[in-house]
């Protein structure tokens, strides 16, 4: 009974990045030692999975009107190789806004009242300019991993540039209802241009976001992209 009160339970405050998914599933379920060991074992299999696994299990998008009209999301992955340069992205998509594919098509987010199509989160926001209480426990967490050689300062810039991928794929994004974060890591194998890697990182992050939507499964009474009827 110790920690920050989030309504349905209390969460211990430690240094971390996490999504708020406690309204989905059993609020009292917690990771244990056996799950941690299994996660380490699975990491050695080199069989990356996406969708409603790991951090993506309880992820949702399009929550301006609450859980009743949002959609199921998940964990997304994407990777590219240009010459010797390798770059991968992973994202847990738990966004306040709507989601678009790399061609600009809306693929997930706020559903209309009878759930026969999409509504626009942005347009819903414009119905009133007065301060309002919104579903503000949203976070999209991503990471970029590259074999390019970069120090901490340059990786910070790459992470910053990668947020362009969020902006292309999520709207609205970076709101006060979001806790959007991106980490950048380097294994330091080859020389690479920072501007090129930063620009490419945004593109690959957009690909990972699309994957998070298209690989998710309907569950907990929430509809996923795969099961849309329109």
Q: PLM features: what roles do these ranges have?
A:
Residues 1-230:
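A structural signal for small-residue-enriched, beta-sheet-centric alpha/beta enzyme cores
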